[in-house]
Every structure is written in structure tokens, then in C-alpha cells.
């Protein structure tokens, strides 16, 4: 088990050795608190976009279903007639310059896996730059937009935001509720009291502290041909090599089991780089991976490699609440 996996297990399931990291946690909390307080006090350069900015992020380390939720937000806003753009850090991307406009025909090593997935799925204008303020400026210079979604960036306080949405894995919760490196929190749990909306991935119903949403598998797509097949393409009990290089691989493996397949799990680091050698498995079985992994594997995919598309399905209460927020932010632009 890699060091990162051991840390995740300790954060979410407990380990006495974590007490040794509490002095470092104290320092981390001081830095984070100071950074946020400077933002609240209006110190430093804070960029206020001329169009509303909605930040969609986490306060925990590990996957929470953020990308599927961003895809849902894009399509939902478009149904209201809004012109939507997205900015992202572009983790792992190595573009020729920054800011960088992501195009669907680029590769993940240039554009980053999550930004490339978002553009290939939706065609949305998307700019990457660790400086999200610079990304917003570049995006607005490139075309007229009504609204910008920031893919993560909760802690990027130089970009003013009009709405903050935080996603939490309902099964994992906040782990031991301690901050890095003694726990999985990027910011103290109290930060949830200041955000606008909290979404719990996998919750069965809305909670007092937030809304429920789930990830619904929708289709299998062949990496080589692009052919879409229904979920019953594989018969019940089909064994598959399951590949997941995401923040919470076990959730993907559980999804395949819920589809009545028998996954042979192959967990990789989040944002992992792949090769033919790394994905040469025995015995010979179909390979099923996440859509995020697929954008990095198409160039060398075999005929029986597939990715599973999943769609975020938020609760009706969240949809109604979010529409109210859109009406508040864009009263003159929103279509019924």
C-alpha cells in the first residue's frame, strides 16, 4: 500500500500515530486561518469578476464526485439559456503557456485529465491556470459569458466568489475531522458554516446540513471506437479488470459490483499517468475504467477497453435551491 493510501486509511479509519502530526496540523491551521482572514479583511489583491463565479470544491482530500456535479451544473445552466465557462487549476497539465484554453482534441498531459474530460463531454469554454483569477480574465477576454464555474479553488481566495458549493462523500464524511497532515481536511470543519451549499455524494436523502446527490451509471463507451453500449452489455457475473485513478477508487469498484459485475480492482493514484505496460493484466478480461482515466488511455487502448459514464443526480430540493440562487445572481438573464 502506497504512503498516500495508508494516510487516507488512517484519516478515515483512525490510527494512534496521527497524534504525532498534531503540531504540524496546528501550524497548517494557523496558515489557513490567516489566509482566509486576509481575504475577509479585504487585504491583498482580490479579483472580482464582472460575471458571477460559482466555486465547486471540497474541504477534504479525496474524491467527492466533483467532476460529475460540474457536468450537471453546466448542462443545467445551459437549459436556462446561460452561457457558461469553466476555470480549473489543471492539475498535472503541462501547457505551452498559461492561461491555457483547453480543446477537445488536446491530450491529458497538456490539458489535464479532468479539464479535458469536461470539454470533451460538454464543449464548454474552459481555461486552466493555477492562478484562477488569470484564468477568469482570459476566459472573459475570449468570449461573452454569463456565468463561470470554478473547478475547485475553495482555498484560492484571490478570486472573489458569488456562491460556494462544497461536496462531501456521505460514506466517508469528514474522517477524523482534523486538518492536514493529521486528517483529511483542507480547512477546519467550521468552514462549512460559511459556504452557501453542501452536497453529500451517496446520501439517500437531504440532511439538515445539506443536499443529497448520487452518481448514476448511464452507459459503457468503447475507448477505441467510441461506441456506446447499454449497461447490460456485460452479463451478470461478468469479470472485468476495473481501473480507477481517482480520489476514491473504492467507490468505482463498488459501482461495478452494484451492476452485478465482478471487478478485479486495480487502484492507481489520483491523476495517474498510464502506459500499455501498466494496464497489461492477466487473465485476459474486458477492462472497465473511469471516464477520467479514459482520456489518458485512448491512444493505446485495446478493443475490449471500456469506460463507464456516470451522471450526477441531485435531489429535487437542491435543484430548486440552485435555481433560486441563479435567479438571485442573474435576474435579467435567466430563462424560465
UniProtKB/Swiss-Prot annotation:
Pathway: Glycolipid biosynthesis; lipid IV(A) biosynthesis; lipid IV(A) from (3R)-3-hydroxytetradecanoyl-[acyl-carrier-protein] and UDP-N-acetyl-alpha-D-glucosamine: step 6/6. Transfers the gamma-phosphate of ATP to the 4'-position of a tetraacyldisaccharide 1-phosphate intermediate (termed DS-1-P) to form tetraacyldisaccharide 1,4'-bis-phosphate (lipid IVA). PANTHER family: TETRAACYLDISACCHARIDE 4'-KINASE (PTHR42724), TETRAACYLDISACCHARIDE 4'-KINASE, MITOCHONDRIAL-RELATED (PTHR42724:SF1). This is Tetraacyldisaccharide 4'-kinase. The keyword Nuclease does not apply. The keyword Oxidoreductase does not apply. Disulfide bonds: none annotated. ATP binds at residues 60-67. One of its GO terms (molecular function) is tetraacyldisaccharide 4'-kinase activity. It comes from Pseudomonas fluorescens (strain Pf0-1). InterPro entries: LpxK, P-loop_NTPase. It holds the Pfam family LpxK. One of its GO terms (biological process) is lipopolysaccharide core region biosynthetic process. The gene is lpxK. It catalyses: a lipid A disaccharide + ATP = a lipid IVA + ADP + H(+). Belongs to the LpxK family. Keywords: ATP-binding, Kinase, Lipid A biosynthesis, Lipid biosynthesis, Lipid metabolism, Nucleotide-binding, Transferase. GO terms for cellular component: plasma membrane. Its EC number is 2.7.1.130.
Amino acid at each position: 500500500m502506497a504512503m498516500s493510501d495508508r494516510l487516507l486509511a488512517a484519516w478515515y479509519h483512525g490510527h494512534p500515530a496521527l497524534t504525532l502530526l498534531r503540531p504540524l496540523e496546528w501550524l497548517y491551521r494557523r496558515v489557513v486561518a490567516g489566509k482566509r482572514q486576509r481575504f475577509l479583511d479585504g487585504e491583498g489583491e482580490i479579483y472580482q469578476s464582472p460575471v458571477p463565479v460559482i466555486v465547486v470544491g471540497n474541504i477534504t482530500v479525496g474524491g467527492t464526485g466533483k467532476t460529475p456535479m460540474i457536468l450537471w451544473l453546466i448542462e443545467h445552466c445551459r437549459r436556462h439559456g446561460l452561457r457558461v465557462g469553466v476555470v480549473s487549476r489543471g492539475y498535472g497539465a503541462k501547457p505551452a503557456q498559461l492561461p491555457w484554453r483547453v480543446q477537445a482534441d488536446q491530450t491529458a498531459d497538456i490539458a489535464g485529465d479532468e479539464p479535458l474530460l469536461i470539454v470533451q463531454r460538454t464543449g464548454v469554454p474552459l481555461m486552466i491556470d493555477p492562478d484562477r483569477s488569470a484564468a477568469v480574465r482570459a476566459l472573459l477576454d475570449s468570449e461573452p459569458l454569463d456565468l463561470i464555474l470554478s473547478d475547485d479553488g475553495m482555498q484560492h481566495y484571490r478570486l472573489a466568489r458569488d456562491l460556494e458549493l462544497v461536496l462531501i462523500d456521505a460514506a466517508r464524511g469528514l474522517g477524523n475531522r482534523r486538518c492536514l497532515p493529521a486528517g483529511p481536511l483542507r480547512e477546519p470543519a467550521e468552514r462549512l458554516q460559511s459556504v452557501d451549499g453542501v452536497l453529500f455524494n451517496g446520501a439517500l436523502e437531504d440532511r439538515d446540513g445539506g443536499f443529497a446527490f448520487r452518481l448514476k451509471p448511464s452507459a459503457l463507451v468503447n475507448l477505441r471506437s467510441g461506441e456506446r453500449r447499454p449497461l447490460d452489455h456485460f452479463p451478470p457475473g461478468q469479470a472485468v479488470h476495473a481501473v480507477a485513478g481517482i480520489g476514491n477508487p473504492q467507490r468505482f469498484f463498488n459501482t461495478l459490483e452494484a451492476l452485478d459485475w465482478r471487478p478485479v480492482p486495480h487502484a492507481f493514484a489520483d491523476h495517474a499517468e498510464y502506459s500499455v505496460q501498466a494496464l497489461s493484466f492477466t487473465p485476459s478480461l474486458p477492462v472497465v475504467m473511469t471516464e477520467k482515466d479514459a482520456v489518458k488511455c485512448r491512444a493505446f487502448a485495446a478493443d475490449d477497453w471500456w469506460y463507464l459514464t456516470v451522471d450526477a443526480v441531485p435531489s429535487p430540493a437542491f435543484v430548486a435551491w440552485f435555481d433560486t440562487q441563479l435567479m438571485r445572481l442573474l435576474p435579467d438573464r435567466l430563462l424560465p
